[in-house]
Amino acid sequence: DRHKCMNNQAIANKYQQLRRAVLAQAQNEFEQFEADFIGHIDLTEITEDAIRSQDEWDIPVNRQIGWDWRQVRDQYRRDHMARVELAVWHGEELCGLMIGKASEGKLVVKINYIQGGEVENPLKGYIVPIASRCAELFAVAIEADWIGIQDPIDDDDLLNYYRELGFDESDPFDPRNNALFKRVVVDED
């Protein structure tokens, strides 16, 4: 069905443009917020370079994650047009990765996978705020009211940190789901 195929391509292109706009806006906001970032920070999609750089991270065993970034990225590219992809760079150094997607009914944009880089990376402490802002900008663009972090790692410090960033509600659509939600705030300007 060629028409459906072309229509899907048009939708895919729309989301591609949206992802790029979100990355550009988030980068711009963080550069304004932290002048030291200008000329150093770069937000991109999860490129081959990003996957290769992530492979080289020296992550201690207790911070290992249970997924393969290449597999996750390829699966999301295949199955989810309305996805968010983020690689956070400081110069040539990859500092974090995130991938997420909009729910079927576009009610929520979820951060499904997120990982910060090596312990001493120059953007330590910024990965979650940057990822969260990207999810939020994507949500605003598709008129979703919520962003969420799916299956957050069960670590008290981390969970408190997520709450401080505003992820302090349980899933309003499925109370049994292990996720932290935050209502999207749209700037009235």
PLM region spans:
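Short beta-alpha junction loops
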Residues: 151-155
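Non-catalytic substrate-recognition and accessory regions of acyl/acetyltransferase enzymes
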Residues: 1-125, 130, 137-148, 163-189
